[in-house]
Amino acid sequence: MAEFPDDQAARLCDNCKKEIPVFNFTIHEIHCQRNIGVCPVCKEPFPKSDMDIHVATEHCQVTCKCNKKLEKRQLKQHVETECPLRLAVCQHCDLELSVVKLKEHEDYCGARTELCGSCGRNVLVKELQTHPAVCGRVEEEKRSEAAVPPEAYDEPWSQDRIWIASQLLRQIEALDPPMRLPGRPLRAFEADPFYSRTASQRGVTAHFPIQNNLFEEQERQERNRSHQSPKDSAENSAHLDFMLALSLQNEGQASSMVEQGFWESVPEADPARAGPTSLGDIKGAADETLLPCEFCEELYPEELLIDHQTSCNPSHALRSLNTGSSSIRGVEDPGAIFQNFLQQATSNQLDTLMGLSSSAAVEDSIIIPCEFCGVQLEEEVLFHHQDQCDQRPATANHRAMEGIPTQDSQPEDRSPELSRRRVKHQGDLSSGYMDDVKQESVKGSTYSLSPNRTMNNVSTCNRLLNSSGPRSDCQRSPPGVLKLNNSGSQDIRGRIRGSQNGPIASAHAPVIHSIRNLYPENLAPSFPHGSPGRFGASEGSRSSRVTPTAASYHSRAAKAKPPKQQGAGDAEEEEE
C-alpha cells in the first residue's frame, strides 16, 4: 500500500471503520460494501465469504478442564492466568502442583524445620527468608529476662490467705464464750476420708492447683518459716494453715456440705500431738490402715474406728438427744464442748429425723434397753416404747388383752353388704310372736279352751315353744297327725268334746288363748289345698309341720289320730 503524504486528507469508511484517502475513498467504499462484512460478535471486518468460518472457529463455546465454558479465542488467556487447575511451583520445595492445592501444601511444607548454621536453632522453612534478620537475637532476649522467684508468685496468694484466716478468726471469736480451736496435726486430717478425697471425687474444679496439694503447701510453709522472725512464725499457727487449706479444697462446694463436713471434723485437743507437724508425718498418713464404718461405710483410721462407731451407732442417737449425759459424767475439754456447740448450730438432721426437740439434760437418769429392738431408752419412756415397739411379737399382747372384754360380749357390727333381707311369707310368724306367748303364759288364762278347738292346735303350739324358746313347765302334749276329712267332722268334734277337751283345756288354756288372739280363723292360708283323699298315713310327719295359721284354718275338718311315741315327736321337733 502506498504511503500517503501528510498533507493529503483521509476519510473514515462506515463499513470497515478504517481511514481511507480522499482520492480513493469512492472506489474503496464501493468495494468494501460489496465484499467485506462486520462480525456481529467481535465487530471485526472480515470477508463475507469467510464469515461463517470465522464464527465457527473463533466464537464457538468450549469447556475448560475446570468445567468453565468460554469462547475458543479466550481459552488460551484463561488457562494461563485464571484457571484454578493450572500448574504452579511450591516456593519451599519447587514442586509443581495445581493452584487449588498449593495453599495447603505450602502450609504443610513450610512447617518443616531446618537447622540454622549461625545460631544453631531449628527454624521453620517458611521463616528461612526472614530468619537472618533476627538470627541470634532471641537467645539474648531470653538471657536478659530475669527469672521470677517462687516467692513472687506466692505474694498475691499470701495476701488472700491472711484475709481468709482473719475472717475465720473473727467469726470464731464472735462466739459466746470465745474459745480457741484446739490444734490438730495435718496428718490426722489427711487420714480423714472427707478431706482425703480428691477434687474429681467431690466434683469440684480446682481453682488453685498449687494450694490444693497439701505436700506442697507444707513445704512452702517450712520455707517461709525459715525466712520469718520467731514472732511472726508463732502467730501463724499450724491450725490456721490447715483451715486455709480446707477453705481451698472445699472451693465450689455447697455451703451446707462444707460447713457440715468441716465442723464434724473439728478434733479434740491432743497436747501430745499439738507440736509442729513434719513433712514425714504427712507422707506417713498415706500408709495408715483405713477401715470402713459398719454404719455409715466411711473410711477411718484403725485407732479411731471404735470411737467413731460408738458415736455413729443409730441406737445411741435417741440416748444422746434425750439424756445429753450418761449416768457416769466425765469432764469435757473445751474442744469437745466447742465441737458439740457447732454441731448443734449447723445441723438439726437427727432432731428432724427422730421427731424430737432438744431438751435439757436429765441428771442421774437410768438407761434400759428395749427387750424387743434393743434401743436404749430412759426408764420413764421405756414402758411406752415397748408397748408400741414395731418388733414386738404377737404373743406379747395376751397379757395386755386380759382386762379387755372379749368380742362376744361386745355388740356385733354387721356389715351392710353381708346382711341379707329375709323374705317374709304370709304364713310366717312375726318377730314378737314368742314374746307375746310368754307374756300370756305368765299372766294366766282368762278364758277356758273353746269347745270348737281341736287337739291339733295344742300340739302345734307346744312344738313351736319347744323349738324356738325355753321349755315351759307345762306338760308337752304328744304330737298328733292331721288328716283332712270333711265327711266326719261333726263326729270327731263330738268325741273330742266328750273325752279329751276337759283335761287338755285346763292344762293349755293360756297357750291356746294366745294363739287364738294372734291368728284369727278367717286368715287365708298361703299354700294350696288338696283333696281329702290324697293324704295318707305315710305323710303324717309332713302334715304335722303345718303352721299355726293353717292348723287354725283347718281345725274344723281335722281328724286327730292317736299320739305317736315320744321319740318320734322329738325327732320332728328337731327338724323344726
Swiss-Prot record:
Biased composition (Basic and acidic residues): 411-420
Entry keywords, A to Z: Acetylation, Metal-binding, Phosphoprotein, Zinc, Zinc-finger
Modification Phosphoserine, positions: 278, 320, 326-327, 409, 415, 430, 450, 531
Compositionally skewed regions (Polar residues) per UniProt: 540-552
InterPro entries: Innate_Immune_Apopt_Reg, TRAFD1-XIAF1_Znf, Znf_RING/FYVE/PHD, Znf_TRAF
Chain intervals for the UniProt region annotation (Disordered): 402-432, 465-491, 529-576
GO biological process, one term: negative regulation of innate immune response
Zinc finger residue extent: TRAF-type: 27-103
Organism domain of life: Eukaryota
GO cellular component term of the entry, any: mitochondrion
Single GO MF annotation: zinc ion binding
One Pfam family of this chain: TRAFD1-XIAF1_ZnF
Tissue localization of expression: Expressed in vascular smooth muscle cells.
Modification sites for N-acetylalanine: 2
Complex and partners: Interacts with MAVS, TICAM1, TRAF1, TRAF2, TRAF3 and TRAF6.
PANTHER family: TRAF-TYPE ZINC FINGER DOMAIN-CONTAINING PROTEIN 1, TRAF-TYPE ZINC FINGER PROTEIN-RELATED
Function in brief: Negative feedback regulator that controls excessive innate immune responses. Regulates both Toll-like receptor 4 (TLR4) and DDX58/RIG1-like helicases (RLH) pathways. May inhibit the LTR pathway by direct interaction with TRAF6 and attenuation of NF-kappa-B activation. May negatively regulate the RLH pathway downstream from MAVS and upstream of NF-kappa-B and IRF3.
Protein name per the record: TRAF-type zinc finger domain-containing protein 1
